[in-house]
């Protein structure tokens, strides 16, 4: 299994070059590598570990298959659910077309491959992280990769580009997702005083925790410098959840006291957000700091969409109708990621995914609260989910590809370490 661990660590590091090459090629490479890692990890598992993996990861993966099934359904030629664009195209061509929900089957197929790659990485990371020493190795790889991504963000930011006399091309947008994932993970690992026990001395542990804390701070500064207010809000929420979990454990608070504190913080944050939202626009774009014309065009796009969406991965195609872009561009075509997801999957599926994400945050937080050693893994997973949940409402649609591997690794390690094997056997 250590060979598989080394492979997944290399794959995590490969998130950097993946974000710099052609998206179509990178999607295929990531899918192939993730499938290979999944096969290798399941083959290397011992019977007891396989049973434990099914227990901790099975329900989550079953829920995660629902979006994949929905994407497949969107690609099927179902004329009674077909997007109206197919009817208009048939009338133009003078021949009936057997349409589907999606308006771009190729784009939807690419999104399906990315989602399945994410699930493959989650399972592989969970299989590896059953052993705490291997989980620590994966976490350190994630921390190093996110630090490298943070450097790229700083060098790609508007002030630095202007100082260097170069135009901002925004090709580094995808690395923002990587950095957002890295901040809570590095912070949680820095606060976990008992989660690095693999023979290191006290001085070595202190040095490692210091490096992790410095990495978390550097990533947070880089993300806020690049993503401005939207990134700062998301990071603040993730950091707050990690710190709250740490404080609850340190002070030995009862679980209901922890839940009450979390609910109070959530209500305060919600009230603040509602007070500062854009009036008279859809909730998905009400909290973004974006130009008024972009917010309005996104609002118009959402108002005209069919209830079932227009297909996974089709935001750019849709936006061409509402935005006056000339040629290929990496600029955001909708105001928020939430708007992009609603445009692709439909409102009902989007809000279902939001609800499932909230349940996942609660489950990981409870696991971190009840865990002994290695509580930082489920705490990091909960904080990452919260960070990204808020980011979809405050940041524009960002390329998902660079963050797929890192996000899957964080969720996988959190699943494997949410419940100890000894406790599961005792229960």
Language-model regions: role of each:
Residues 3-17, 34-39, 109-278, 318-324, ...:
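Alpha-helical transmembrane segments of multi-pass inner-membrane proteins
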Residues 6-20, 38-120, 218-221:
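N-terminal hydrophobic segments of proteins, predominantly signal-anchor/transmembrane helices
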Residues 23-41, 56-58, 306, 406:
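Loop-to-helix transition at the N-terminal end of transmembrane alpha-helices
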Residues 24, 73-85, 155-163, 274-286:
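Helix-to-loop transition at the C-terminal end of transmembrane segments
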Residues 39-57, 125, 271-296, 340:
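Cytoplasmic juxtamembrane interface segments
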Residues 59-60, 82-94, 286, 290-305:
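Extracytoplasmic loop-helix module adjacent to an early transmembrane segment
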Residues 74, 295-331, 335, 346-349:
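TM-adjacent membrane-interface loops and short helices in multi-pass inner/ER membrane proteins
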